[in-house]
């Protein structure tokens, strides 16, 4: 189309959804921003004009750098992320990087983006404690974990293992909440199970439980 481009670039999506939780103590997060045309893009922690935004993204500025979704990628690293609070960022872009400044179209409104700082995930209790008894060859035992804090008040996904080896963990039957349970049918003996829980911000917590079956 030979007619001049008078439309500012549009940010279509981001590699991390806005309002996502981030891990406690992370400080910075790498992000990809996807734009509908070649552009130069910037970000700031304040809503301000493109020309005075402090941070420049590393953007695809050539038509040949289009991705499979027909978008152009900008890479950046969002810094200054604080724990336990909302972290607001603002993005703006300017199109036609090879044209004179007066021919380029710039965003007059920012693309708002938010990351939610979190706190450490805690395992507050594990069960069973002590001894489990029954009057059959196998005794039903309920493993239980209770989690708190973290990205979303303890909501997390927990796994258990009898060895603690990296690939030995199995998702607990009831999880994705603050209480996590798993029924096992065990024979007489001494048992030690390890638990590993991870929340939606990537915070992790581990614990173990030791008990006997009589």
What feature does the model see in each segment?
Residues 34-40, 47, 145-157, 164-166:
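Short proline/glycine-enriched turn/loop motifs at strand-loop junctions of beta-rich domains
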Residues 7-23, 123-136:
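Short, solvent-exposed loop/edge segments of extracellular or virion-exposed proteins
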């Amino acid at each position: 189309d030979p007619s001049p481009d008078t439309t500012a670039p549009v940010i279509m999506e981001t590699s991390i959804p806005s309002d996502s939780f981030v891990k406690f103590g992370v400080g910075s997060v790498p992000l990809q921003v996807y734009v509908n045309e070649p552009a130069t893009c910037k970000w700031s922690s304040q809503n301000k004009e493109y020309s005075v935004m402090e941070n420049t993204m590393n953007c695809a500025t050539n038509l040949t750098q289009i991705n499979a979704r027909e978008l152009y990628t900008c890479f950046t690293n969002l810094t200054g992320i604080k724990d336990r609070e909302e972290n607001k960022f603002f993005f703006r872009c300017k199109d036609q990087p090879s044209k004179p400044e007066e021919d380029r179209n710039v965003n007059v409104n920012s693309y708002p983006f938010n990351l939610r700082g979190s706190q450490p995930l805690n395992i507050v209790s594990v069960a069973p404690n002590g001894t489990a008894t029954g009057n059959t060859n196998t005794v039903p035992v309920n493993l239980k974990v209770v989690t708190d804090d973290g990205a979303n008040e303890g909501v997390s996904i927990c796994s258990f293992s009898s060895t603690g080896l990296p690939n030995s963990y199995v998702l607990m039957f009831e999880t994705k909440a603050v209480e996590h349970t798993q029924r096992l049918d065990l024979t007489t003996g001494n048992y030690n199970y390890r638990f590993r829980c991870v929340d939606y911000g990537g915070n992790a917590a581990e614990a173990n439980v030791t008990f006997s079956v009589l």
